[in-house]
UniProtKB/Swiss-Prot annotation:
Pathway: Amino-acid biosynthesis; L-histidine biosynthesis; L-histidine from 5-phospho-alpha-D-ribose 1-diphosphate: step 7/9
Protein name: Histidinol-phosphate aminotransferase
A single BP term in Gene Ontology: L-histidine biosynthetic process
Organism (species): Haemophilus influenzae (strain PittGG)
UniProt enzyme class: transferase
Protein family membership: Belongs to the class-II pyridoxal-phosphate-dependent aminotransferase family. Histidinol-phosphate aminotransferase subfamily.
InterPro entries: Aminotrans_II_pyridoxalP_BS (IPR001917), Aminotransferase_I/II_large (IPR004839), HisP_aminotrans (IPR005861), PyrdxlP-dep_Trfase (IPR015424), PyrdxlP-dep_Trfase_major (IPR015421), PyrdxlP-dep_Trfase_small (IPR015422)
N6-(pyridoxal phosphate)lysine: residues bearing it: 211
Requisite cofactors: pyridoxal 5'-phosphate
PROSITE patterns: AA_TRANSFER_CLASS_2
Assembly information from the UniProt record: Homodimer.
Keyword check for Amino-acid biosynthesis: yes
E.C. code: 2.6.1.9
Length: 352
């Protein structure tokens, strides 16, 4: 008997999520994790590190509720959006009995989180234009307790039709929780489904400070939902989920002055995205630049592997999507600074 064989069988067979950092590389330009290209400057204001943190940091809860336009009863603070995903699966799905459903190509952590919890996964691929296939979803809802959708979708960058999300909420009412992952919503805030919370008690929204707020290293996310759903999740979440320093910096990030700064910097990044998309379109190696509402672009190349490898060797680290469903020869490029975008274009231009 070895340590490995003592572990659960599903864990022995598990292929872990391949995060950008785990994939590594020796880059000087990191455009593979959808991080903001520059870091904000905050200073820790508290020194009470000898005390355990609050179960839920109330100043952060209040600040995010104000920002999102909801009540504090609608907010649960989590260790990044990923903990929110895991928490919902653990709370609502019986292992080896219930299933989640998601629509690839999409964020890989839905599948990994279900697998580690011993929960089944069902998939209904997106349509050719990366939208929900509602008839097929309806046909696959047996035993499904949670449906995950991502809008803007990672890695494709497009928005799901809000009318389709509304239809999804209607066909799942009384049957399953619908989770809308809005990790990238700050880049298109008008597309949020937060206005649907009051009418759909089975809707949960995932948010994060990792993207537009440029705080990926903080690991601070949120679940937004009706009070009953939040109360149930609160039974399961760890007793001290948010470290004191993380709560301190998150509260500073959510002050009105910094939110205004984030919104201004977001406009600058969107300008860089527009420039990058136009510049990539004219390159001989690039066959298509997909429309994006997020801080990244998905491109289809004549030879995606050659482009990815050539830039990797120059220290420009992108995200290879070649093995992702329907994304052969595709690469995801995080929108960086204008200088970084220019270097990406020049490097791809040189690929033969």
């Amino acid at each position: 008997m070895t340590i490995t064989t003592l572990s659960r069988q599903n864990i022995q067979a598990l292929t872990p999520y391949q995060s950008a950092r785990k994939l590594g590389g020796n880059g000087t330009i990191w455009l593979n994790a959808n991080e903001y290209p520059t870091s904000p400057e905050f200073q820790l204001s508290g020194k009470d590190l000898n005390r355990y943190p609050e179960p839920q940091p109330q100043r952060v809860v209040q600040a995010y509720a104000n920002y999102a336009g909801v009540s504090t009863e609608n907010v649960l603070v989590t260790r990044g959006g990923d903990e929110g995903i895991e928490l919902i699966i653990h709370t609502f799905c019986e292992p080896k009995q219930d299933a989640i459903l998601f629509c690839p190509p999409t964020y890989g952590m839905y599948a990994v989180s279900a697998e580690t919890a011993g929960v089944l996964s069902k998939t209904v691929p997106l349509t050719d234009d990366f939208q929900l296939n509602l008839p097929e979803i309806k046909n696959h809802l047996n035993d499904v307790k949670v449906v995950f959708v991502c809008s803007p979708n990672n890695p494709t960058g497009n928005l799901l039709k809000q009318s389709d999300i509304l239809d999804l909420l209607q066909i799942t009412a009384g049957k399953a929780i619908v989770v809308v992952d809005e990790a990238y919503i700050e880049f298109c805030p008008e597309a949020s489904v937060i206005n649907l919370l009051k009418n759909y008690p089975h809707l949960a929204i995932i948010r994060t400070l990792s993207k537009a707020f440029a705080l990926a290293g903080l690991r601070c996310g949120f679940v937004l939902a009706n009070p009953e759903l939040i109360d149930i999740l609160s039974k399961v979440i760890a007793p001290y989920p948010i470290p004191v320093p993380s709560a301190d910096l998150a509260e500073q990030a959510l002050r009105p002055a910094n939110i205004a700064t984030v919104q201004a910097l977001t406009q600058e990044l969107l300008s860089n995205r527009q420039w990058l998309a136009k510049a990539l379109l004219v390159l001989h190696q690039v066959e298509k630049v997909y429309e994006s509402e997020a801080n990244y672009l998905l491109i289809k190349c004549q030879n995606g592997q050659a482009v990815f490898k050539a830039l990797w060797e120059q220290g420009i680290i992108l995200r290879d999507q070649n093995k992702t469903l329907h994304l052969q020869n595709c690469i995801r490029i995080t929108v960086g600074t204008r200088n970084e975008c220019e270097k990406v274009v020049e490097a791809i231009k040189e690929v033969k």
